[in-house]
Amino acid sequence: MNSKKRLSLLMIGATVTSLMGGTVSTYAADNTETTEPLTIAEQGIFSAGGITITSDGTFNPEDQWEETGAGQTSHVDYANVLYQIPEEETSLPMVFLHGYGQSRMGWMTTPDGREGWAEMFLRDGHSVYLVDEPRRGEAGQTSVSGTISTKTLDQRWYTQFRIGRWEDGKSVPNEGSQFPNDDNSVDQFFRQMTPDTGMT
């Protein structure tokens, strides 16, 4: 990659980062607990399972933009796993599976910006493995076509996950719930939802 192109990409990245940072940085900073630094010995991402499908025909390297997929393969229906191993591993590893409508993001943080379950277990000496299940999140490649829903379902998620009830346009947490019920936290919770990319 030439230096001019690299500089352009860096400038675009910096612009996007600054725009995104302006929308969330203050909120996250106000809601992060002060804790000791977390030391991770190793971390990475890998994919597991899935299949490889091949389309009939012959791939033509001269025509990169043809849309039939003739003679090409697609790696699909795999899981994607983010793992982190603490510097001092003293307990059994933990595997985190998300629920319906979610991804591993739900284990990584809380709606009000505090450390999530994954970091809590890391601090306690557990290796953590955070799975994005097939056809969801970072494992979105699918062998089964379908229509991604655009239905407006925020309040249903709030109720189905037993956080509370939605009444008169407001979230009402269940008694004893520790869910942070300020407007920003509710907004961040709804932004954790993610669709299936293929029918199951």
What kind of region is each of these model predictions?
Residues 98-110:
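Active-site glycine-rich loops that stabilize anionic/oxyanionic intermediates
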Residues 30-89:
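N-terminal cap/lid segment of alpha/beta-hydrolase-fold proteins
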Residues 2-11:
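Bacterial N-terminal signal peptides that target proteins for export
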Residues 114-140:
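Conserved alpha/beta-hydrolase
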Residues 17-26:
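C-terminal segment of classical bacterial N-terminal signal peptides
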Residues 91-99:
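Short beta-strand element of the alpha/beta-hydrolase
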Residues 38, 43-45, 57-67, 144, ...:
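Alpha/beta-hydrolase
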Residues 58, 106-109, 140-143:
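Short, solvent-exposed loop/turn and secondary-structure capping segments
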